[in-house]
Amino acid sequence: KSYWLRLESGELTKEQVTVGRFRTLFEELGIIHVAPEQVNADYQRELGNVFFYMEDAEELVTQLKEKGYRQYVVTNGVNSTQASKMKLSGLDKIMDGVFVSELMGYPKPRKEYFDACFAAMPGVTRGECILVGDSLTSDMRGAQNAGVASCWFNPTGRAKDVEVRTDYEIRRLEELLAILEPSKK
């Protein structure tokens, strides 16, 4: 079971995941004079200094903002890294909020994580939400646990390898508009 899956199931903490993956790698490669904690700190710092938009992403989130849609980021990522990426990419000015699991007290896909998210979004009901994500285990299962609609972003068309409900599936982000505004197809 991968480190991230073990985080999702509550078996590991975020630090055990982020440091443990380097510790395991170094053990497998026989590297003994490198501190996985320091490598992880350096990695997280540098990871926060780069970003890229997936095709159609910047245009889509900007268009949705202009149309009045409220948009939130839900992530199991590292808080400092996510905050840096949000600012660097300009998404901090587009998104209405960011919910990082380490600050919420629970990882995606736990129901408690989403309960905490909804508690921080006054006036937002589950019935008006859709979770768009690329992970079957954290995003689609999370949507199911949260009681919201789900849209699996599956750009490569891979087969489902996990039994989980997906309400929609898209290959390109621009396809989301037809789901949100079906009468304007």
Name each region found by the language model.
Residues D42-E46, K67, V78-T81:
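Conserved acidic, metal-coordinating active-site core of Asp-based
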Residues T62, Y72, G77-K185:
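Asp-based, Mg2+/Mn2+-dependent phosphohydrolase catalytic module
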Residues D56-G68:
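Catalytic-core regions built around general acid/base machinery
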Residues K1-Y3, E37-A41, V61-T62, I94, ...:
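A short alpha-helix capping/helix-coil boundary motif
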Residues K1-E55:
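N-terminal helical cap/lid subdomain that shapes the substrate entry/recognition surface
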Residues G10, G48-N49, R70-Q71, G127-E128:
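A generic structural signal for short
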Residues E28, K67, A120-V124:
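Alpha-helix C-cap/termination motif
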